[in-house]
Structure formats: C-alpha cells, structure tokens
Amino acid sequence: MDLKTVLSLPRYPGEFLHPVVYACTAVMLLCLLASFVTYIVHQSAIRISRKGRHTLLNFCFHAALTFTVFAGGINRTKYPILCQAVGIVLHYSTLSTMLWIGVTARNIYKQVTKKAPLCLDTDQPPYPRQPLLRFYLVSGGVPFIICGVTAATNIRNYGTEDEDTAYCWMAWEPSLGAFYGPAAIITLVTCVYFLGTYVQLRRHPGRRYELRTQPEEQRRLATPEGGRGIRPGTPPAHDAPGASVLQNEHSFQAQLRAAAFTLFLFTATWAFGALAVSQGHFLDMVFSCLYGAFCVTLGLFVLIHHCAKREDVWQCWWACCPPRKDAHPALDANGAALGRAACLHSPGLGQPRGFAHPPGPCKMTNLQAAQGHASCLSPATPCCAKMHCEPLTADEAHVHLQEEGAFGHDPHLHGCLQGRTKPPYFSRHPAEEPEYAYHIPSSLDGSPRSSRTDSPPSSLDGPAGTHTLACCTQGDPFPMVTQPEGSDGSPALYSCPTQPGREAALGPGHLEMLRRTQSLPFGGPSQNGLPKGKLLEGLPFGTDGTGNIRTGPWKNETTV
C-alpha cells in the first residue's frame, strides 16, 4: 500500500450525505405533506379554482418525490439497477415539477387576459367546464416520453457514468439533450408567461381577483329576499368583491409572485443539491448547507402562502380542532347549569343577523327565561344569543316593539358593555321616535320580579322583517332575589343609547336596550334586589300614587 492510498480521503458522498441534507429535506416534506393533505381533505371549503388546486397538488407531489429520491438514493452507487432507477425517477420528476409550475403560470395569464362574458342572464355558464386531462398529458406525458426515449436508446445513460462517479444520475452527453435542454425551454416559456401576466396587470390595474361567474338563479338567491328588501338608493356595503364570488382568495399579483418565487426556489434547491454531491470535500459541505436553506425555504413558503395566509384554510384547521369546554357554564334562575348550549350561537360569515320569520311582535315569558331559552348568563364575558319569537298574547308578559319602517342592516355586532356610573339615556329626537310599548314582565303568579332573567336587555338590529335579540350581561351588584308581593320596589329600567354616526345608517327603527346599573349613593340593596332609599327619585321615570310606573313617551302602565 503506497503513501497516496493511505493519505487519500474517501470519495464523497460515500454511504451517507451531510446530516443537514436529511434534516432539511424532512422539514420540507412535512410542509408539502401538510399542504397536500389540507387541499385534499378540505377541497370543497377552500376558495380556489379547479385548475389551481390540481396544479398545486401535483407540484407538491412531484417536488416531494424529487427531493425524497435525491436524499435517499443519490449515492446508492453500489447497486447498479437501483442507481439506474434513481436516475430515471429524478429525470422524470424534475421535468414534471417544472412543467406544473409552467402550467400554473399559463393559468394565471389566461385568467388575467380573459374577457368578461357578454351575457350573464343565460342559464348556461359563459365558459364551459374544460377537462384537466390536457394538463396531465403535458405535465406528465412529455417527461414520460423523454425518459422513455432516453432509456430505450441506451439504458446505460442512467446510473453512474464511470467508476469515479459518486452519484446516480445521467451520462453527460445524453443529459444535455434529454434534461438540460428541455428544462431550459420550460423555464423560458414559464418566464414569458410571467412577463406577459405582469404587463397585463400593469395595463389593467382593475383586474385584481379571479372571480367566479354565478348563474342567474344563484344571483337572485344571493340578493336579500330576492331583491325586495333593499332600499332604493342604498349604496353597496363595500367596494371589494364578496367572498362568495371569489374564485381564489389570493389576488393575481400574489399568485404571480408566488409562482415566480416557487420556480426560483425549486431551481436553486435542485442546483445546490447537485453541486453538493459532485464537488470536493470542502465545497460539498458549503453546498449542502445552501441546499438545506433553500429546501426549508421552499417548503415553508408553500405552506405559508397556500395555507397560513388564507382565511378559509384557517377556518378549516380550526374546525378540525376539538371545541374547548366552557369554564363558566351558564346558570338558570335556580343556580343549575343550563343544558342548552345553543345560546352561544353566533351568526356565521355572510349570514344575516336575524330570524327568518314574518314581522310580528316578540314575547318572552319568565318560564322560558328560567329554562335558559331567553338569555345567556355567562359570568365571564357577555354573549349574544338568538331567541325564537312567538306571537303576542294578551295574558302573558312581553316586550312589544312596533315600528313603522324597516330596520337597517348592520353586519357588525354592537358593543354590549356600557359604563356603570354613566348609564345611557334616551337621546333620540321625539320626531324620529316610533311608538314603542314597554311592558314590565311579571312572574307566573302575577307578581313583578326583579331578576335579570325576567327582563333581559335586548338589541334589535337586522334586515327587513327580521328581529335579532342579543343579551348583554354585566356584573350585577345586586343579589338575584325574587321581589315579594306587596313590595314597593320598582323593577330595573332599561335605556336606549345612541351611537354617533350609526343612527342615520340604522334608521328610526333601531332600538338598543341595555340594563341600567348605578352606584349606591343612597344605601345598600334591599331584600328585593334594589337599592334602598330614594334612588328612584334620580331616575328619569317616576311612579305615580297607585304604584304604576310611567315610562316616559310610551305612556303604558303596568299595575302591581
């Protein structure tokens, strides 16, 4: 054994690659797998076109196949048949991945340059649904033909070129025409699509989102009450396109940047991986680290752009998580936990805040309040509950609100919390106030009650012909004690605050009733749950000699 053989270093990569290659490849595979599974499981809930979903799924699959075979078999030179198979798979998957990126660029360009349909009132869609087989024939068939011709010409074109080659790939001369030439053409055509899309977006700044054409029947159903509940001259709620008509949540500019950056990351990762297994002992470590950095960047970019930056994907992810148990369950009037959790229901995205029943009076009995059908009494946070309304009867206590016009629609929830020391008063102009009838609810035996389950605060705000009742609970400094018969205490009062800039938009029919709580300057609470002393003297509404409560402009009385 001569000195040269003793001092010579083993040829790289040897039996194993640098550890950073395996670690970073595993991270990228996890990111691609998460994106792939998300778009497979929740394909009906994610707003993306059919072409975009297929191109993304195929890109994730072929990119994962490319780097998995690279990390696991690029240095298996001791097994000739396995080495040839690794070279064939790398050849096919690399060209297929680049072609799927090119198909993505082509689809973006077609969407940007697509003209608006001439007729929207026909039952047939203006653009027929085209099959996706052509994309699979191009992105999967072309690489298959190239690999088949190369292998049929000479199977030894794959594998190790000679004994000194330490990686499984292709011979140099066949690779020029079978791989590097087609890869360069694909990259050039893809860049031309990118440039054309960029020019079109600069010339037409208004083309920002990919919209989905809706049939006439769906457009009529999307209009509130078939187009009858909209006031004439009412401006649209917002200028941006609605979520129901978006074909893709990302804009064209975001899709263009993502496709271009994906092509750059994939090309750079592949190049650094090839240099990591073909260079000397020191450069292999440098290029292995560069390969790992770009590999992780590619996986994280795909996961962040296509999943983490999309609201619909986040909704799908949260829907898969088990719901948390309420740490503070709602209690009824007797202190028992309520079995019904439907009171914590909140309106979903795009749903009107109201009930689909004809306009009519709404009533709430004490029995329903005690059973938990009327309000939510969560001691932690206020909640907004939906209550079913029934026709008004003459022998039951109720809260009757009669309006002359239609309610204005407000898609946002009202703020429920108000200050204790500054209770809101009626500030609506008398000329704008419709006629309201407020009746103090009574118990089942006819005696008035002061519990907050008897007369919950409510807020009415919804489209025409609908009512929305939201209970807004606050910390009550008074104990929940039923008022005995013959007591001279008065039940709690409610007020209607107004918010600047909202009264004109909501219309005269808007009424928001909140519980009025005050400090106790005249003494502590009595046994009936109300403060002692002459606290009622400072209230805007007093009582007459017969014990009736006068409620200001309503002039309705309830005899105790």
Curated annotation (Swiss-Prot):
Pfam families the record matches: 7tm_2
Main location, first listed in the record: membrane
Localisation: Membrane
Biased composition (Low complexity): 447-459, 529-542
Transmembrane segments: 20-40, 54-74, 85-105, 135-155, 176-196, 258-278, 285-305
Signal peptide from the UniProt entry: none
GO CC term, one of those recorded: plasma membrane
Ranges per topology, Extracellular: 1-19, 75-84, 156-175, 279-284
One GO biological process term: cell surface receptor signaling pathway
Keyword Protein biosynthesis attributed: no
Keyword vocabulary terms for this entry: G-protein coupled receptor, Glycoprotein, Membrane, Receptor, Transducer, Transmembrane, Transmembrane helix
Compositional bias annotation for Basic and acidic residues: 210-222
Any GO molecular function: G protein-coupled receptor activity
Cytoplasmic side of membrane: 41-53, 106-134, 197-257, 306-560
Glycosylation-annotated residues: N75
UniProt xrefs under InterPro entries: Adhesion_GPCR_A, GPCR_2-like_7TM, GPCR_2_secretin-like, GPCR_2_secretin-like_CS
UniProt-annotated stretches for the region Disordered: 210-242, 438-473, 521-560
Topology of this chain in the membrane: Multi-pass membrane protein
Family named by the database record: Belongs to the G-protein coupled receptor 2 family. Adhesion G-protein coupled receptor (ADGR) subfamily.
Protein role: Orphan receptor.
Name of the molecule in the record: Adhesion G protein-coupled receptor A1
Organism expressing this protein natively: Homo sapiens (Human)
Native organism taxonomy: Eukaryota, Metazoa, Chordata, Craniata, Vertebrata
